[in-house]
Amino acid sequence: MTARMDKRFAELKAEGRPALVTYFMGGDPDYDTSLGIMKALPEAGSDIIELGMPFSDPMADGPAIQLAGQRALKGGQTLKKTLQLAADFRKTDDATPIVMMGYYNPIYIYGVEKFLDDAIAAGIDGLIVVDLPPEMDDELCIPAIRKGINFIRLATPTTDEKRLPKVLKNTSGFVYYVSMNGITGSALPDPSLVSGAVERIKQHTQLPVCVGFGVKTAEHAKVIGGSADGVVVGTAIVNQVATSLTSDGKATADTVQAVATLVRGLSTGTRSARLVAAE
């Protein structure tokens, strides 16, 4: 639903602060725990949720998110169950935008039309499919947009002036700027380079620009949020889940609370980010 995403960014703009966009892996380490995590995210200060779709060959993900996907798959998580996770979340939260993030193969096997219909029914607002370039927009991007689901594109430091308009052409919701080349979980990039990149992208689009890769702490979120419309945190949250588990990968009584504590800290960073921008 494009309206929910647009409304959230409009609210944040009025507040003068960037969005905190939080990623977690659906089904990690099990369905009930991940639903608990999902419900805890907005309560702890998350503005937009990225719901990871586990996949057996996640080529763009670092070790932490790969392991999270493996735990979820081992626990029986499927794309259908990930959609159900969103639907269960929507029973108590109709305001927080949900973006499903992952790879095309599970969607293709599920069936594009069925997936989009089920995603709408589950209350999904957007998609990030990392292995579908603009040249393949007819596969999923265009059908999603026609049904009212945002299709969010990734831009990187190597997305030059010639490539950028093509990347942005059918993008909606927001632009996800991957602040460095490589896999997820990398170190924090140079804030001045991030600021310049965000400014460059904004010369080509009116969409919000959210920055991810490398953000792990409240201070990181504060610094990056000083120039971006949103700060995306994924690996730090997935690591927080992992460190709370038992030696055999099972959830503990502290798993959900551990994630909530981290997100509350990150939220203090984004909520003070505009103070940095104004100084």
UniProtKB/Swiss-Prot annotation:
Amino-acid biosynthesis is among the record's keywords: yes
Catalysis: reaction(s): (1S,2R)-1-C-(indol-3-yl)glycerol 3-phosphate + L-serine = D-glyceraldehyde 3-phosphate + L-tryptophan + H2O
InterPro entries per record: Aldolase_TIM (IPR013785), RibuloseP-bd_barrel (IPR011060), Trp_synthase_alpha_AS (IPR018204), Trp_synthase_suA (IPR002028)
EC number(s) from the headed UniProt entry: 4.2.1.20
Location of the active site: 50, 61
GO function terms (MF aspect): tryptophan synthase activity
Organism superkingdom: Bacteria
Keywords, alphabetical: Amino-acid biosynthesis, Aromatic amino acid biosynthesis, Lyase, Tryptophan biosynthesis
Name assigned to this protein: Tryptophan synthase alpha chain
CDD domains for the chain: Tryptophan_synthase_alpha
NCBIfam families linked: trpA
Assembly information from the UniProt record: Tetramer of two alpha and two beta chains.
